[in-house]
């Protein structure tokens, strides 16, 4: 489980770096590792979706394993711990889905509509929509990283309580 969680953290850091590079490529129009903005952004969005899916899978898989252990214990403490697991899921899954929707929507709006329908001369006409959407997406993504970190900590605390038998 710890190796799985560490791989989630590594992917989240790699994902944040990719998104930062992609945004800066769009603003300053430079190539990175021989790829243009569209090519690198496609890579970044694939890493983003993979990372968010991996984090969701972590909480689903560990939650299922914890449920099996707690069901065997059948105590009031086990019920309380299961309620904490459900609270974590209610906390993290909506944040992940909102982040996926915002970043994915930004990607589709930018590359699917703006780039395909404009030239470099008139791309600024969409900045009134693009920039607020970009800011909201970045803020939401950073907020979801905090929520994920807190959720990982809570999940580990629950596993520690189960391991210690309390």
Indicate where each model-derived feature is located.
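Short membrane-interface loop/juxtamembrane segments of multi-pass integral membrane proteins
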Residues: 69-95, 158-166
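Hydrophobic alpha-helical transmembrane segments of polytopic
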Residues: 8-15, 41-44, 97-104, 130-133
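Hydrophobic alpha-helical membrane-embedded segments
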Residues: 16-20, 35-64, 135-144
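Alpha-helical transmembrane segments and their immediate juxtamembrane interface regions
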Residues: 2-5, 116-162
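Alpha-helical transmembrane segments and their membrane-interface junctions
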Residues: 17-25, 95-120
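Membrane-interfacial hairpin junctions
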Residues: 27-38, 114-123
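Alpha-helical transmembrane segments of integral membrane proteins, especially early/N-terminal helices
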Residues: 1-27, 98-99, 158-165
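Loop-to-transmembrane boundary segments
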Residues: 2-10, 80-107
